[in-house]
């Protein structure tokens, strides 16, 4: 809404609407994370939400991250760029035999651009922290966009 001087005005209803949308987005993301946390698809075993299992099975690129060896909601803390950070990795796959780690961070946003820079920075922090723990391992990081189950590899430079 604009006032008579042409300035944009925000009404209480606008503020409440934005707050409700943010709460809805947060609640939706939390529910999706909890559902994905329990999904396992490995050697004939299927555990978790049937709809999610179906979506994951239809995408071989994603399927490999949902085996029994994958860890979920993994706490991680350390110092990055002189600042203490405490994080939680959504899905972590460590292959000790090949010295390789995959990090998967779930994002429920439909508009990828809104917080993209923050998401990339967050994933890069995971990589830096894990790199301190596993300096001899190759680490790949991904964002799994849950609205369309697309997987995006994050560049680490």
What are these regions (language model features)?
Residues 1-89, 95, 119-121:
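Nuclease catalytic cores
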Residues 83-157:
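Mg2+/Mn2+-dependent nuclease catalytic core
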């Amino acid at each position: 809404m604009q006032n008579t001087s042409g300035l944009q005005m925000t009404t209480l209803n606008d503020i409440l609407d934005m707050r409700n949308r943010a709460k809805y987005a947060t609640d939706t993301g939390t529910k999706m994370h909890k559902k994905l946390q329990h999904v396992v698809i490995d050697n004939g075993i299927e555990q978790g939400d049937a709809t999610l299992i179906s979506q994951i099975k239809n995408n071989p690129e994603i399927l490999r991250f949902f085996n029994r060896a994958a860890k979920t909601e993994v706490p991680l803390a350390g110092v990055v760029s002189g600042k203490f950070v405490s994080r939680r990795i959504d899905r972590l796959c460590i292959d000790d035999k090949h010295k390789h780690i995959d990090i998967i961070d779930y994002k429920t946003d439909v508009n990828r651009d809104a917080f993209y820079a923050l998401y990339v920075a967050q994933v890069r922090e995971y990589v830096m922290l894990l790199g301190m723990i596993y300096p001899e391992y190759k680490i790949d990081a991904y964002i799994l966009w849950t609205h369309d189950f697309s997987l995006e590899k994050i560049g680490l430079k």
